[in-house]
Amino acid sequence: MSGHSKWHTIRRTKGVNDQRRGQLFTKLARDITIATREGGSGDPDLNFRLRLAIEKARANNMPNENIQRAIDRGLGKSNEAALEEIFYEGYGPGGVAILIEAATDNRNRTNSEVRATFNKNGGNPGEPGSVSWMFEQKGLITIDLSAVKHDPDELQLMAIDAGADDVVVDDETLEIYCDWTQLNAIRQALLDQGVPVANAEKIMRAKTLIQPDEKDALAALRLIEKLEDLDDVQKVYSNLDITAELVARFDA
């Protein structure tokens, strides 16, 4: 398993083991609310981003009533405060660029929490545009190789034929990167050929990765973990080359 895949697997497992399911549901609900509002529809058949958010929520056993409540909030049918999507930028130890996607109903609270987390963990919050140029918007499709009958080489060719820009294969997963606007078409092409898709989402992918020394890399990973643990933070992206060896050292 690649370092990035292993890192997110560990984070998901730790979330369950630490009884953070409530926090997970909050983040999933915010994804659904933002997707509903941005897509202008509460119908997943008409709103692809919402469909992906609902599929991810159901994969994590989120109750249907929670999903509907989040959709209603996005449609303005709720008494809850409106959410806004905000991006934060900064640097971690070793010059690691960090891009944060947040969803909040209180910008001042989130600003304060993000800045404090950077400052307490060896990082530096940055101005808008300070690191975002190092990332590009992509679609990401993840396939669990243990759940498919096709071999990795065949899957790679299928993905490229469907329009993928890049395919990363390791022992357990196959990650397909594509233009975000092509995500639905490529996902559907794979499903039509009998390939189960474990996850599909819009991401910000670093254009290049860096490898600071181990001390700085571990410190950067600690900062990323702290940022991911903030209630208002949905996703954290970085240009850190998260190797399997680094994750093993971090988890030791």
UniProtKB/Swiss-Prot annotation:
Q: Which PANTHER family match?
A: TRANSCRIPTIONAL REGULATORY PROTEIN YEBC-RELATED, TRANSLATIONAL ACTIVATOR OF CYTOCHROME C OXIDASE 1
Q: What is this protein called?
A: Probable transcriptional regulatory protein Caur_1043
Which Gene3D superfamilies has this protein been placed in? 1.10.10.200, 3.30.70.980
Identify its protein family. Answer: Belongs to the TACO1 family.
Return the Pfam families for the record. Answer: TACO1_YebC_N, Transcrip_reg
Where is the protein situated, by its record's location annotation?
Answer: Cytoplasm
- Keyword Metal-binding among record annotations: no
Per the record, the GO terms for biological process are:
regulation of DNA-templated transcription
Q: Does the keyword Transmembrane apply?
A: no
This protein's source sits in the domain of life called Bacteria
Region described as Disordered: 1-22
Task: Drop me one GO molecular function for this one.
Answer: DNA binding
Keywords per UniProt: Cytoplasm, DNA-binding, Transcription, Transcription regulation
Q: Name one GO cellular component term.
A: cytosol
Sequence ranges of Basic residues compositional bias: 1-14
